[in-house]
Amino acid sequence: PNTASYTYNTAIGGNNATVLTNTNVKGYAFSATGGFTLNSWHGLSGSAFYTFSEAKEVTANAGSSASSAWSGSLTVNSPNEQYKTLSNFSVPHRIVANLTYNIKNTSIGVYYSGANQGRFSYYYSNDVNGDGVANDLMYIPKSDAEIKFVNITSGSTVLFTAQQQLDAFNKFIRDNDLEKYRGKVVPRNGFLLPWNNRIDLRISQTLFNNMASKGDKVQISLDFINFGNLLNSKWGIQDYNVSSYGAAILSKSGSAATPDPSFTMLRDGSNLVSSPTRPASTTATTWTAMLGFKYSF
């Protein structure tokens, strides 16, 4: 089109357009579940099930608009690359179980759920390949000669030297099972968040089964959500990545066009990042208790 007919809208602040279309590369999803159910045995009932699943995709459409969906897909060369990888939502193993014991008017139920908490990728925090998009998967150098660090400074103060960062980076590779990717780009969504075990407990007591001979019932209940965390503050806590899309470990120094880039390691608080995840000890993941009252008529 004649570009003279298009003007920049300063009210919106946008100067580019993203056009999405269907890909010719097809993904797939597969899952299988097996288990057993205990209907009733001496007041006990329950079930246990295991699910295996696998899914591969070209993109997870990681965004709320066309532009962010396009640029949010981590890649090697360009967001326009169409290649199939494990889905961001592909959690391979999941176990769920429940066991309930009923005796007269009392019921005690235990519920368990165990699974990895998701997938993530290692990537650079900024644009490394010069395509204008900060979505580049991380390359693990074969040796120290393939990566160059620069000091991290604050004013005239050196916070971390280049050698300290190199040592920390090599330790990160060893500690997080990345040695096998030496000389390679890490796969997108190739890593699992830690396994999480969650146990819930419910105790209920029926006080009156037939109030005023009308069949009305009164029941009180006590629910412990994430009961394991009540027993041990480290149990049942979820983990999340140190970065929004996964684990950004390195940041490129200088402009995107630099042919021989230098890097700095990112920090987690006041220290150099040492793990791709951290525990999320918030009210959303710690234990809670609920007292319930139910009147049935």
Where is each model-derived feature located?
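Gram-negative outer-membrane beta-barrel transporters
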Residues: 1-120
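Aromatic-acidic/polar surface patches that form glycan- and anion
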Residues: 23-29, 37, 85-92, 185-197, ...
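Alpha-helical packing segments of well-folded alpha/beta enzyme cores
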Residues: 32, 95, 198-202, 289
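Outer-membrane beta-barrel proteins
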Residues: 38-42, 103-108, 203-213, 218, ...
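Outer-membrane beta-barrel translocator domains and adjoining extracellular loop/strand segments
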Residues: 59-65, 121-127, 233-238
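Extracytoplasmic gating/loop element in the C-terminal half of outer-membrane beta-barrel translocons
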Residues: 107-212, 219, 246-278
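Gly/Thr-rich phosphate-binding loop signature of adenosyl cofactor/nucleotide-binding cores
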Residues: 224-226
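Outer-membrane beta-barrel "beta-signal"
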Residues: 284-297
